[in-house]
């Protein structure tokens, strides 16, 4: 059995070398020890999976965009190749999502003892079911969306009672949960309500903000406000379709 400290160091080396698949493997072994992860370990695990999934999500969006343009042109010969390529990326996305969801359900959530870590892991569970919902269709999409909603709600229930409104993990949860309402459930009204409530609650308690989380919290508050501005203009018909995909997951790396 690998030593925990060695595995963490291997993960840090892999991160520096930008070899995120190996970073995932090291942190999966730590998670498999069924112990409460430290904040540093938790963040290493999150960053590892986020980079592995992020590259594929970006690829999927580009391929889907090319597919759409080709559909408009009516280029059937190329469409078959594009669709097969997209499906290959979707298979990779599915494997990564199912992998981390399995680690969360079997190891991380059962071993979590603090409110903070429970919120972090349930939020993560919501995020990866959301990523599945992004490309799934029919019943698969419905199931992924329902699983995501349940996980985000579980995280929210704990966050509301155990974390202050200015806590970066609580704010990050509100950010991602509101994106879920907007993008997956097509409910801009609920997305705006959630984001606005989180922003207003944090503003009201800004004086309680600890020095170490000030930068993280204010950054996420800015993102909440940016999303609100974008969504409000979209609802009024002013905004053109914009891809703000990069906004919602920024908080994971710094907590």
Swiss-Prot record:
There is a cross-link at residue 50 (Glycyl lysine isopeptide (Lys-Gly) (interchain with G-Cter in SUMO2)). Keywords: Acetylation, Cytoplasm, Host-virus interaction, Isopeptide bond, Nucleus, Phosphoprotein, Ubl conjugation. The modification Phosphotyrosine is found at residue 131. GO terms for molecular function: cadherin binding; calcium channel inhibitor activity; calcium channel regulator activity; enzyme binding; histone deacetylase binding; identical protein binding; MHC class II protein complex binding; phosphoprotein binding. The record marks 57, 130 as: Interaction with phosphoserine on interacting protein. The record marks 236-237 as: (Microbial infection) Cleavage. The modification Phosphoserine is found at residues 65, 210. The modification N-acetylmethionine is found at residue 1. PANTHER family: 14-3-3 PROTEIN. Adapter protein implicated in the regulation of a large spectrum of both general and specialized signaling pathways. Binds to a large number of partners, usually by recognition of a phosphoserine or phosphothreonine motif. Binding generally results in the modulation of the activity of the binding partner. Positively regulates phosphorylated protein HSF1 nuclear export to the cytoplasm. Plays a positive role in the antiviral signaling pathway upstream of TBK1 via interaction with RIGI. This is 14-3-3 protein epsilon. It comes from Homo sapiens.
């Amino acid at each position: 059995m690998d030593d925990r400290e060695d595995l963490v160091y291997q993960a840090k080396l892999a991160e520096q070398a930008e070899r995120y698949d190996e970073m995932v493997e090291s942190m999966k072994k730590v998670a498999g020890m069924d112990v409460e992860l430290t904040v540093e370990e938790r963040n290493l695990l999150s960053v590892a999976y986020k980079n592995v999934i992020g590259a594929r999500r970006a690829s999927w969006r580009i391929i889907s965009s090319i597919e759409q343009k080709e559909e408009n042109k009516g280029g059937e010969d190329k469409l078959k190749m594009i669709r097969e390529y997209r499906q290959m990326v979707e298979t990779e996305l599915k494997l990564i999502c199912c992998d981390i969801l399995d680690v969360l359900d079997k190891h991380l959530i059962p071993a979590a003892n603090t409110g903070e870590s429970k919120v972090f892991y349930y939020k993560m569970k919501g995020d990866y079911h959301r990523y599945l919902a992004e490309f799934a269709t029919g019943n698969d999409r419905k199931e992924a969306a329902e699983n995501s909603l349940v996980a985000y709600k579980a995280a929210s229930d704990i966050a509301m009672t155990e974390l202050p409104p200015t806590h970066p993990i609580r704010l990050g949860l509100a950010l991602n949960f509101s994106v879920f309402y907007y993008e997956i459930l097509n409910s801009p009204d609920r997305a705006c309500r959630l984001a606005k409530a989180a922003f207003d609650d944090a503003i009201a308690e800004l004086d309680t903000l600890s020095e170490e989380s000030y930068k993280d919290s204010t950054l996420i508050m800015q993102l909440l406000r940016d999303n609100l501005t974008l969504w409000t203009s979209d609802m009024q018909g002013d905004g053109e379709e914009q891809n703000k995909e990069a906004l919602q997951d920024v908080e994971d790396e710094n907590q």
